Curated annotation (Swiss-Prot):
Its main location: secreted. One of its GO terms (molecular function) is toxin activity. Expressed by the venom gland. InterPro entries: Huwentoxin-1 (IPR011696). Belongs to the neurotoxin 10 (Hwtx-1) family. 51 (Hntx-8) subfamily. Hntx-8 sub-subfamily. The presence of a 'disulfide through disulfide knot' structurally defines this protein as a knottin. Keywords: Disulfide bond, Ion channel impairing toxin, Knottin, Secreted, Signal, Toxin. SUPFAM superfamilies: omega toxin-like (SSF57059). This is U3-theraphotoxin-Hhn1g. It is found in: Secreted. Ion channel inhibitor.
Length: 87
């Protein structure tokens, strides 16, 4: 009888310990996505888009000239790929 009480106590203590470990792990995991997203979307000066002298694909070409390989569409006023009928 004593042996059964001891095994039940150890089982219960093990379950409580497992609950505490899982709770601590889950609380850390809740903070992890927030930290990850803030580091991904953090604005870094090295990765800011540089101003170009020319406009790239589907950029407005009113004031800027299109980069090489693109032409300014008279219809949409955007830089597009040249097509045979646009030449």
């Amino acid at each position: 009888m004593v042996n059964m009480k001891a095994s039940m106590f150890l089982t219960f203590a093990g379950l409580v310990l497992l609950f505490v470990v899982c709770f601590a792990s889950e609380s850390e995991e809740k903070e992890f996505p927030k930290e990850m997203l803030s580091s991904i979307f953090a604005v870094d000066n090295d990765f800011k888009q540089e101003e170009r002298d020319c406009a790239g694909y589907m950029r407005e070409c009113k004031e800027k000239l299109c980069c090489s390989g693109y032409v300014c569409s008279s219809r949409w006023k955007r830089c597009v790929l040249p097509a045979p009928w646009r030449r």
